[in-house]
Amino acid sequence: MDPVPSSASHGNLDEQIAQLMQCKPLSEQEVRGLCEKAKEILMEESNVQPVKSPVTICGDIHGQFHDLAELFRIGGKCPDTNYLFMGDYVDRGYYSVETVTLLVALKVRYPQRITILRGNHESRQITQVYGFYDECLRKYGNANVWKTFTDLFDYFPLTALVESEIFCLHGGLSPSIETLDNIRNFDRVQEVPHEGAMCDLLWSDPDDRCGWGISPRGAGYTFGQDISEQFNHTNNLKLIARAHQLVMEGFNWAHDQKVVTIFSAPNYCYRCGNMASILEVDDSRERTFIQFEPAPRRGEPDVTRRTPDYFL
């Protein structure tokens, strides 16, 4: 085991977290130092990262910093609450930089109390289209912070397993994956590929139709109840929890309550009018959804994005 960081470095990190909680970005140099520490922690985590309950499971955030602050207000501060985030921290919202920096800082400060999975937006290619790249340029005057973060994204775990029974990931299942060991055995440290198992985990969606289907997203697959039932049976799972899709109530059951979608960005893109939710799993593995609405905004710019939408 590495030695625990000294209290001096904790103090510095606590100051950075306090600054980020006020939605003030760190310097480029501070981001670089933070991401170096985060990489050392994330390198040790598994493609299927084990997580103990109690835990609060969260879906997409998409740079909606004030709503993330609201999430922590409702769900409890980290480290008081153990958190599991299922990806898509950046793009679309106005504060991707502050959002992802805060989550990474919390990971470095409390590595056992927060798990950050990779979403399909934690990728070099997607962030160049949907806002994170442009935001880094605007806030730092160059692309260095974007590069630092997208290099770090390669190390984020792809999935998590809560108490051996709730399988958590951003997107969904893959026709090339039958078991959790299949996932444990591949090399995740790379840009999200255009196809194949790793791509599918971050891009696929559950569907009402049986079997595998072609995804309208152009990546991943749709998978039916027969597929999720087989996967859950093979791997001794009770539930698949995933994010990746806007759901108006903040959560949505599928496949006879064996798959749930959790979405944690209320009024998505500042215009969708949806609720957000988080899923609390307690010591006895009882599950409770907590829904929330957007945090009150003061003087926030009205962001109109010129980027294409995919709400599918």
UniProtKB/Swiss-Prot annotation:
GO terms of molecular function: metal ion binding; protein serine/threonine phosphatase activity
Chain sites annotated for binding Mn(2+) 1: D60, H62, D88
Subcellular location: Cytoplasm
A Pfam cross-reference name: Metallophos
Active site: H121
Transmembrane region(s): none
Cofactor entry: Mn(2+)
Coiled-coil regions listed in the entry: none
The record's free-text note on cofactor binding: Binds 2 manganese ions per subunit.
Top-level taxon in the UniProt lineage: Eukaryota
PROSITE patterns membership: SER_THR_PHOSPHATASE (PS00125)
CDD domains named in the record: MPP_PP2A_PP4_PP6 (cd07415)
SS bond list: none
Biological process terms in GO annotation: mitotic cell cycle
GO CC annotations, alphabetized: cytosol; nucleus
Positions that bind Mn(2+) 2: D88, N120, H170, H244
Catalyzed reaction equations: O-phospho-L-seryl-[protein] + H2O = L-seryl-[protein] + phosphate; O-phospho-L-threonyl-[protein] + H2O = L-threonyl-[protein] + phosphate
The protein, known as: Serine/threonine-protein phosphatase PP2A catalytic subunit
Species in which this protein is naturally found: Nicotiana tabacum (Common tobacco)
